[in-house]
Amino acid sequence: MKERLPHEKGFHVSWDQIHRDSRALAWRLDGQGPDNGSWRAVVGITRGGLVPAMIVSRELDIRTVDTISVKSYNWQEQQAPTVIKAPQAELMGDGHGILIVDDLVDSGKTLELVRTLYPRAHFATVYAKPSGRPMVDTYITEVSQDTWIFFPWDMALQYVEPYRGRD
C-alpha cells in the first residue's frame, strides 16, 4: 500500500464545524461533573484546545478557566511533550472536578503527560485518533490515525507557515 503524505488524507475543519463540534462536546459533558453534575473549572491545553475550551466553558457557564501549555510538536514532527506553563496549583489539586479540553488526541502523549499531573481530571477532546483514544474520557468524532486534521487557525486558502517560525 502506498504511503500518503499528511495532506493527501486531510480532514479540513472549518470555523463553523469546530464551533458546532465543540458545542456538541459541551452538551455531552453537561451534567457529567463529579459535583452534582458540575465542573469546578475548564482547563484548555494550548494552543489547539483554547477555542474548544472557550466554547465548552461558555456553553456550560463555567467561569473559572485556565490553561496548560504543552509542547509536543516541532513543526510537523511529534516529540516528547513538555509542560511550558501549568495552571494554578491551588485550582488543580489532583484534578477532581476539572475538565481538561483539547482539540485533538493523536498519539495520546500530551494527554498522558497531563493525566500524570492531574489523575482525577476529566479529559475531553473534539477529535480522537485510535492511538490516543484510551487517554480521553469524552470525545465527539473519531478519525483514522493516518488522517491529518487541518484546523482553521492553521490555514488560509492553503496552509500558511506561522509568521514567527515553525512552532
Curated annotation (Swiss-Prot):
Among InterPro entries, the record links this protein to: PRibTrfase_dom, PRTase-like, Xanthine_Guanine_PRibTrfase
Q: Where does 5-phospho-alpha-D-ribose 1-diphosphate bind?
A: 47-48, 79, 102-110
Q: Which GO terms describe its cellular component?
A: plasma membrane
Indicate which residues the UniProt annotation says bind xanthine: 106, 149
Identify its membrane topology class.
Answer: Peripheral membrane protein
Enzyme category, top tier:
transferase
Molecular function (GO) terms for this protein are:
guanine phosphoribosyltransferase activity; hypoxanthine phosphoribosyltransferase activity; magnesium ion binding; xanthine phosphoribosyltransferase activity
Instruction: Please classify the protein's predominant subcellular localization into one broad category.
Output: membrane
The UniProt record lists the keyword Transferase: yes
Reaction equation(s) it catalyzes: GMP + diphosphate = guanine + 5-phospho-alpha-D-ribose 1-diphosphate; XMP + diphosphate = xanthine + 5-phospho-alpha-D-ribose 1-diphosphate; IMP + diphosphate = hypoxanthine + 5-phospho-alpha-D-ribose 1-diphosphate
Q: What is its EC number?
A: 2.4.2.-, 2.4.2.22
**Amino acids binding Mg(2+):** 103
| Residues bound to GMP | 79, 106-110, 148-149
Q: Which cofactor does it need?
A: Mg(2+)
Q: Where in the cell is it found?
A: Cell inner membrane
Describe its partners and assembly state: Homotetramer.
**Do you know which HAMAP family this protein is assigned to?**
XGPRT
Instruction: State the function annotated in the UniProt record.
Output: Purine salvage pathway enzyme that catalyzes the transfer of the ribosyl-5-phosphate group from 5-phospho-alpha-D-ribose 1-diphosphate (PRPP) to the N9 position of the 6-oxopurines guanine and xanthine to form the corresponding ribonucleotides GMP (guanosine 5'-monophosphate) and XMP (xanthosine 5'-monophosphate), with the release of PPi. To a lesser extent, also acts on hypoxanthine.
Identify its protein family.
Answer: Belongs to the purine/pyrimidine phosphoribosyltransferase family. XGPT subfamily.
Its recorded name reads: Xanthine-guanine phosphoribosyltransferase
Source organism of the structure? Cereibacter sphaeroides (strain ATCC 17023 / DSM 158 / JCM 6121 / CCUG 31486 / LMG 2827 / NBRC 12203 / NCIMB 8253 / ATH 2.4.1.) (Rhodobacter sphaeroides)
